[in-house]
């Protein structure tokens, strides 16, 4: 079986960290993972509304304010859970912001809040694997 994962973050270093964690997931699940990367909110929304994913890893703060259709990550999460093929897709919401309000909003839309600070690749990989297996 093969899994399809969307990694949406404007920071290339953060996308690489998620990629490393997903390599560990591949070993845990003993299955292949196709990783689709996006760097803007506009590109991310286009993927979320048109393609089915087994897991979504979503940033909050995209630096594409200059693009028409720009959305913050929390708005992308809300839209994904309301329309399109990813309503029930497990979604990890990554943010350097440790606001309780943001965390509450993420949980309201069935997302899993994942702080960028203290990112432990092995623990994160296990979280990703657990969510993919349950889907």
Show the residue positions of the predicted features.
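Acidic, metal-coordinating helix/loop segments flanking the phosphotransfer/catalytic sites
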Residues: 19, 36-55, 62-65
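Conserved phosphotransfer microenvironments
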Residues: 57-81
